[in-house]
Amino acid sequence: MRLLILERDHALYAALLMAADPSLKVVAGDDPLQLIDAASECSIWLGQPDLVAQMLRQGVHPVWVQSTWAGITPLLAADLPKDYSLTRAVGIFGQVMSEYLLTYMLAHERQFLGRLASQVGSQWDSRTPGGLRGRQVVIVGTGEIGQAVAHTLSGFGMDLTGVAKNPRSLVPFNRMGSLDDLGRLVETADYLINLLPDTPDTHDIYDRALFARLKPTALFINAGR
């Protein structure tokens, strides 16, 4: 089996795949223009969507593309072919995204940047830090990643509101709402977290009018696409 890897971390992916199956014939790189001939001989491609899109525009068609990203927006462009199987990376980003968001939330509550500046300037910082318990969090996007984030934040005693296109009861959210409810739900939020993908349906959800409804002290974290 011949496999094409189009990834900036192609060496790592190639090493892992070869260790798992030494019989694989792997062609790997991060410059589509240098791999056109090799790509035409590979029916299976593994790679990041922006590089895969460049290869598709060269007229080379795979049978199956496995994206290394959760998002596949570059592959949805109107000028690209759609006559192949496309799968994306799922089930691996929940922990990473939870840690990413928690880092910013703790830094915000503990006023980390201001305290660091005081420390560098050899100044005593007497500000009282905040905490996460009881904070109102609105998470927009309650798929696999959103649920993983909610489970992490629930351990800190935060009050969680989930927003989805088709809301349904989900643990550990305290309540659920639809996108039509978003304007009302953000009014009491201490944190507004976006986890939505970049699709035509998600354009212009966050606008001046929505942000005007947030409390002055609220923090918006965009971890979506």
Q: Which role does the model predict for each range below?
A:
Residues 6-7, 48, 68, 195-198, ...:
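Short, well-ordered coil/turn residues at beta-beta hairpins
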Residues 115-148:
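Glycine-rich NAD(P)-binding loop of Rossmann-like domains
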Residues 83, 133-136, 217:
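Phosphate-coordination loops involved in phosphoryl transfer and adenosine-cofactor binding
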Residues 36-39, 56-59, 132, 183-187, ...:
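A short, aliphatic-rich alpha-helical micro-motif
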Residues 41-116:
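Phosphate/diphosphate ligand-binding glycine-rich loop within oxidoreductases
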Residues 155-172:
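NAD(P)-binding Rossmann-fold cofactor-contacting core
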Residues 167-225:
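Rossmann-like adenosine-cofactor binding region
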Residues 1-44, 157:
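N-terminal glycine-/charge-rich "phosphate-binding" loop or analogous flexible N-terminal tail
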